[in-house]
Amino acid sequence: MSKEDNVMNSFEEQANELMKERFQKLKELQSNGKDPFDVYKVERTHTSKEVKENYEDLEGKTVTVAGRLMSKRVHGKAGFSDIHDRYGKIQLYIKINDVGEEKLKEYKTFDIGDIISVTGTVFKTKTGETSIHITDFQLVCKSLRPLPEKWHGLKDPDLRYRQRYVDLIINQDVRDTFMKRTAIIKTMREYLDNKGFLEVETPILSPIAGGAAAKPFITHHNALNIDMYLRIATELYLKRLIVGGFEKVYEIGRNFRNEGMDIRHNPEFTVIELYEAYADYNDMMEITENMIAYICEKVLGTTKVQYEGTEIDFTPPWRRLTMVDAVREYAGVDFNTIKDDIEARTIAKEKHIEFKKELKDCTKGDVLIGLFEEFCEDKLMQPTFICDYPVENSPLTKKKRGNEAFTERFEGFVFGREVCNAYSELNDSIVQKERFMQQLKERELGDDEAYMMDDDFITSLEVGMPPTGGLGIGIDRLIMFLTDTHSIRDVILFPTMKPQPNNQ
């Protein structure tokens, strides 16, 4: 058994004893007609933040606050305590002359973690700390399970994620991260709304998993007796709305992919996709860099952020680099001189590039992407748009003007990681159907992430979709960069976890 396991077991043993004591206190409260769970509402007049920010107006006046008791230093006839609410903490002062002997005795029985409401007058201590001089109080929820005394001392890497509610109680920096997450998404909406985009909602359950190369989660609809998929992307439904005349749309929501989990991947994750009629991928680059800069300025106050000890500068314009140029710069291979698939496979073999399919089935485009992923991605530390992807790897994208071996697609990279993906959207229904047919062949070769045929989407393109630019941004990854967070689990409130034995 590891040292960390011993610490956890010791804590659980202590917690069990303390829980017995707390259950006994609850029984006594209930027998005395003071059951905290009979409290339905608290008439709170102020939050901790409001008391502190409005001290000059509130000094000497009576307020009622509520929160979780996080420290208690009451000895003899007086003492101090701290309660925490959403906005932070505020100090309380209690004295026997103000509440009486019985009430003070009751207050002393409160445990760390209990939730109380307090009424009292606002004042400042000799050290200048804004506090509340208690005249009355009420226990509104009894905490039966004790909080860890030293949360950072617990080494179980999963515990904070499994018990996020405790993590949020104990760690101010965790609360700050998720408050920033909310602010980032709110500001993203604000930017797009101000640009005339319309926020919409599209299906999460669909008979076809489309819009991305990924493994879907499969479920079954009993009434219709059909298998359905949790969406892997919102793209194809949003494009249908462009066809329908909604010229600027976006959706922020969860996507689901039945794939591996690591510090950058969670099976369900938050993405924004947006589409603009009469625009192309150059416009999407401008939206990306300008929107992220706007978010940085509004939420963080700067476009220069620290991430894992490196300064990342999100100031527009970002660097623009074609994939061919990136491979030439970082892998030392000039793809403009590669004549065909056979020559490309030879290069792949020399460079020891591995693929999901057999090397003999790989195209020149497959090899280009393989070289990029192997030699280039991790070099792209500052925000960079990698442009012009091979046509065979971008089935929903228009061909590059002037070079039909490539497409008008870019991905944005920061700190060696992809954060966004965008196209000049393919709107030719005939070509789109041909691309889908080629993807079906890829599936037959064993690529279970290749696109499915979506006949209704083809039908919508036959009705007619104007030239359109489309963009998708991984919100979780963006938030990781803007909060200097190492793992995606640290920016998702309740990340996917393997159940523990006995559901513990």
Curated annotation (Swiss-Prot):
Gene Ontology MF, one: lysine-tRNA ligase activity
Signal peptide: none
Subcellular localization, as worded in the UniProt entry: Cytoplasm
InterPro entries the UniProt entry points to: Aa-tRNA-synt_II, aa-tRNA-synth_II, aa-tRNA-synth_II/BPL/LPL, Lys-tRNA-ligase_II, Lys-tRNA-ligase_II_bac/euk, Lys-tRNA-ligase_II_N, Lys-tRNA-synth_II_C, NA-bd_OB-fold
Pfam families per UniProt: tRNA-synt_2, tRNA_anti-codon
Reactions that this protein is recorded to catalyse: tRNA(Lys) + L-lysine + ATP = L-lysyl-tRNA(Lys) + AMP + diphosphate
Cofactor remark from the record: Binds 3 Mg(2+) ions per subunit.
Disulfide bonds: none
One Gene Ontology biological process: lysyl-tRNA aminoacylation
This enzyme's EC code(s): 6.1.1.6
Cofactor(s) it depends on: Mg(2+)
Residue sites binding Mg(2+) 2 per the record: 418
HAMAP family: Lys_tRNA_synth_class2
Similarity-based family: Belongs to the class-II aminoacyl-tRNA synthetase family.
Name this protein carries in UniProt: Lysine--tRNA ligase
